[in-house]
A protein has these predicted regions:
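Conserved phosphate-binding elements of NTP-dependent enzyme cores
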Residues: 1-912
Length: 913
């Protein structure tokens, strides 16, 4: 086997025909400035080719179901293994995914509870034993005399297929009737079932009327049904549409509650046999939230305090006003009283109705006027009812503005049906186990006491559970619980979970490509992560890690530095070799920072702030322990702490959502806290995250920052455009008129290729220029609109230097280090760090009131030390004009330049907050 991977002539995105040699079975770090072409080399070239070759080896039928990669723009790659990419973008937003399901630990837990669990009665909690035929007969005979019943054998329960053989066997055995998915059939008719749907089939063994003398016949029928279905009998009470399930397997003698034999699917909240029927296994339900109906309690009803759909129109002839007038008269309150001064009784009547008491309603409509007498259902009940009844998606979305998620009242947020939760191992049900942190769960498994027989059954299952929990601990995630939703994890956490899952599979000879696994990790947890990556390497795998973290670079076997600049100024290999060799390579910015020749300076003086404070009292969301926090306004504040210590809970869940609701009038529910003081010194809150600035190729930095409007107006003001009668709309590629209609302004046409990836080809009519010929004939300083959009920010600065509005916006893009980005570059091709800096530039170009608070969650993600320095300068500019910046960060360079630090801890999870 070759000892290296050789890439020849890589030209993807901004790569300049690069040749590179990567040693196999080593920890290799790819580094370089943001936008220099690291991801293009690692993900778009090496991973794409490795994945493509693997998928091409499969059958054409299998290829239909797998996303096909395009062949990357590269001459050839030699010595490539199957590639597995672990990046940050693929966090599951599915509400059904939890840490347990993603790591597959939950599958082993379901098996453990099904095989060695002790069932209890869900009603009285008593341990359940199996039922005998005699016990079943006694219970059936307790039904009232003359009750008509059917004794049925449930032969198929929730299995896919047409099940033709089941019906054939039943006919041969002389049975006449059956019930399929709740519908009765005659076995003489042809029963066609859908092959890919799950079905329930019960064969009718006997039909009886309850009398004293039927015991013997009933016994025979129950025995036959039990033998047919392997121990289960269904007694259907005719006329009541009620089924009683009996099991020779498990039932409670006192309550008569039967449960079927324990199977792993009973413990799955993604399966109808295990999921709570009320919330279908989600653990939460959408409920109308009074806080969102009346977001601002300082207003009165007449001033529009109630913002709920259908109740916000307070015009004197409206339906809502008719009800409010009647309520005010009956319960003696004034409609101009601020909501916060209304009594609890009055608020209760407005929200939850008059509970049957009638109101006298006076209506005066164009159709006539008169008086009505009727009860009022209350705004909350009205919204709930309309939500259940409406068929319109738009109406649903409008009503959801007044709703928030709350734990399901049936299962208390535990996702499973009560029968499943009544099964215990070591005294715990499966949900209680999943609510333990990884450390506590490991401790529980280590000290689990089982009988000798149980131990023999559970031995291999426990071994798998222990090893997987151990891997989660080894990547610094010991504070997570298995029941935590995958959607609530940060990018770094979800990436390390998938890393732990990969170690669990213990493959060798694989090429792993990782995208900044150290994100969101405190320096303390970094060593654990490095050890994990070295373990993966020692198994015989090659690790290619895109990373800026200094510790990781020093621990690497080999470093490849891509650069020297970003965008068009990058795309070359500046240095490659061991960390020592890179440090001594002239022209490598990475080498200069690693060797200490370049450093980010500590500021000479720190901002004192404006003397005002923003105070949070009693913060208690997630693991926060009723803490009080002060943030000095007009400063650059850094919130630090180990992973899982509560930083995001404090900043994103409480601070951002509360300020968003109060200052920006956004309908969100903030995390648990007592109160916040100091909001009056602020006028808005802005969260600058790394989400894309647009989801389609039509959005670009020019459209996002507002530059494009100014550029279109500039073109519309030229003599040529005026003579032709063109307005600014003519120069938009999103509307008819100026754009090329063949590609509708995309510049590309999508050609669907079945079994092969879709191909995008430049439009033949406009040659990829997005506009029609007439529009492109209008020039400004010798360039048409397409050529202007193709300029980079650096090229556009001298071109527009006499136009202050455009020049100032371009200057801010250049200041945040995006000089290499084209004005019309599709937003889908920007990295997270680049998208975040486009947003920062947009903020910098606005007129500042000096009363804004900016919130950033780990802004150094994807940034090289050189870029971090630029970022710090930009954030200082926001602070210099009086704004407040709050940053969650682990990067020591950012922390040392902050004016104020809030450190949470001391540990993650239960040990933090």
């Amino acid at each position: 086997m070759q000892d290296h991977i050789y890439v020849k002539g890589a030209r993807e995105n901004n790569l300049k025909n690069v040749d590179v040699t990567i040693p196999r079975d080593k920890l290799v770090v790819l580094t370089g400035l943001s936008g220099s072409g690291k991801s293009s080399l690692a993900f778009d070239t090496i991973y794409a080719e490795g994945q493509r070759r693997y998928v091409e080896s499969l059958s054409s039928y299998a290829r239909m179901f797998l996303g096909q990669m395009e062949k990357p723009d590269v001459d050839y790659i030699d010595g490539l293994s199957p590639a597995i990419s672990i990046d940050q973008k693929t966090t599951s937003k599915n509400p059904r995914s939890t840490v347990g399901t993603v790591t597959e630990i939950y599958d082993y837990l379901r098996l453990l509870w099904a095989r060695v669990g002790t069932p209890h009665c869900p009603v009285c909690g008593k341990e359940i034993k199996q039922q005998t035929i005699d016990q079943i007969i006694d219970q059936v005979l307790e039904l009232p005399e003359a009750t008509r019943i059917q004794v049925m054998a449930p032969v198929i329960r929730g299995k896919k297929g047409e099940h033709a053989k089941v019906f054939e066997d039943a006919r041969r055995s002389g049975y006449v009737r059956c019930r399929v998915d709740g519908i009765a059939y005659d076995l003489s008719e042809e029963i066609k079932l859908e092959k890919n749907k799950k079905h329930n089939i019960e064969i009718v063994v006997d039909r009886l009327v309850i009398r004293e003398d039927i015991a013997r016949r009933l016994t025979d029928s129950v025995e036959i049904a039990s033998n047919l279905s392997g121990g289960l009998v269904v007694v259907n009470v005719v006329g009541e549409d009620r089924d009683i399930l009996f099991s020779q397997n498990y039932a409670c003698e006192d309550c008569g509650v039967s449960i079927e034999e324990l199977t792993p699917r009973m413990f799955s909240f993604n399966n109808p046999y295990g999921a709570c029927p009320a919330c279908t296994g989600l653990g939460s339900q959408l409920k109308v939230d009074p806080e969102l109906i009346i977001p601002n309690k300082d207003l009165s009803i007449l001033e529009g305090a109630i913002t709920a759909s259908g109740w916000s129109n307070i015009k004197s002839d409206g339906i809502a006003r008719m009800y409010f007038d009647a309520l005010a008269k009956k319960y003696r309150f004034k409609l101009d009283t601020p909501a916060k001064n209304l009594s609890p009784e009055v608020m209760d009547v407005i929200l939850y109705g008059t509970r049957g008491e009638e109101l006298t309603l006076h209506y005066d409509q164009p159709r006539g006027k008169g008086t009505l007498h009727q009860a009022f259902e209350g705004i909350c009940n009205n919204l709930e009812r309309r939500y259940k009844e409406t068929q319109s998606d738009a109406m649903r979305r409008e009503l959801e503005d007044c709703m928030s998620e709350c734990p399901c009242p049936t299962c208390q947020g535990r996702r499973l049906r009560k029968e499943s939760l009544a099964v215990t191992v070591g005294g715990l049900d499966i949900d209680a186990f999943c609510r333990k942190s990884v450390t506590q769960a490991l401790d529980f498994v280590d000290h689990l006491e089982l009988t000798e027989v149980q131990m023999r059954i559970a031995e291999r299952i426990l071994k798998e559970i222990k090893s997987r929990l151990g891997f989660l601990q080894s990547v610094g995630l010991q504070y997570l619980t298995l029941s935590r939703g995958a959607g609530s994890l940060s990018g770094g956490e979800s990436q390390r979970i998938r890393l732990a899952t990969q170690i669990g599979s213990s493959l060798m000879g694989v090429l792993y490509i990782l995208d900044e696994p150290s994100i969101g990790l405190h320096q303390r947890d970094n060593d654990m992560l490095l050890k994990t990556m070295q373990d993966l390497r020692d198994l015989g795998n090659t690790l290619l890690v895109v990373e800026h973290d200094e510790d990781t670079m020093r621990a690497a076997d080999y470093i490849i530095d891509v650069g020297p600049g970003a965008g068009v100024h990058g795309g070359e290999i500046v240095a490659a070799g061991t960390p020592e060799e890179v440090m001594n390579t002239p022209g490598s910015i990475t080498g200069e920072y690693l060797s200490g020749r370049r450093k980010i300076p500590v500021p000479r003086e720190r901002q004192k702030g404006n003397g005002k404070l923003l105070k949070v009292f009693g913060a208690a969301e997630n693991n926060l322990r009723h803490i009080d926090v002060e943030i000095p306004l007009g400063t650059f504040t850094c919130v630090t702490g180990v992973s899982g210590s509560g930083k995001s809970s404090l900043v994103n869940e409480i601070l951002y959502k509360k300020l968003g609701a109060d200052l920006n009038r956004v309908k969100v529910r903030a995390g648990r806290h007592d109160r916040i003081e100091g909001e009056e010194f602020l006028d808005k809150v802005i969260d600058i995250d790394q989400s894309p600035i647009g989801r389609t190729p039509r959005s670009n930095p020019a459209t996002y920052t507002g530059l494009f409007n100014d550029i279109r107006e500039l073109f519309a003001s030229t003599q040529d455009a005026k003579a032709r009668g063109y307005g600014p709309g003519r120069f938009s590629f999103n509307t008819r008129g100026g754009r090329c209609e063949a590609c509708q302004g995309d510049g590309l046409l999508k050609i669907e290729m079945h079994f092969l990836p879709d191909i995008y080809v430049p439009c033949e009519v406009c040659k990829g220029k997005r506009y029609n010929r007439e529009t492109l004939e209008v020039h400004y300083k010798g360039k048409n609109i397409y050529e202007v959009l193709e300029m980079t920010v650096d090229e556009a600065l001298p071109f527009f230097e006499n136009l202050p509005r455009i020049y100032n916006r371009l200057k801010t893009l250049e200041e945040v280090g995006l000089g290499y980005v084209k004005l019309g570059q599709a937003s889908t091709t920007l990295s997270g760090g680049e998208a975040q800096r486009v947003k920062l530039a947009t903020e910098l170009s606005k007129r500042s009131t000096g009363r804004t608070i900016y919130i950033l969650d780990e802004p150094t993600t994807g940034l090289h030390s050189y870029d971090v320095q630029r970022l710090i300068e930009v954030l200082q500019k926001l602070v210099d004009v009086g704004n407040t910046v709050v940053v969650i960060e682990h990067n020591l360079d950012v922390i040392k330049t902050a004016d104020h630090i809030i450190d949470l801890g001391p540990e993650g999870g239960d040990g933090g907050g």
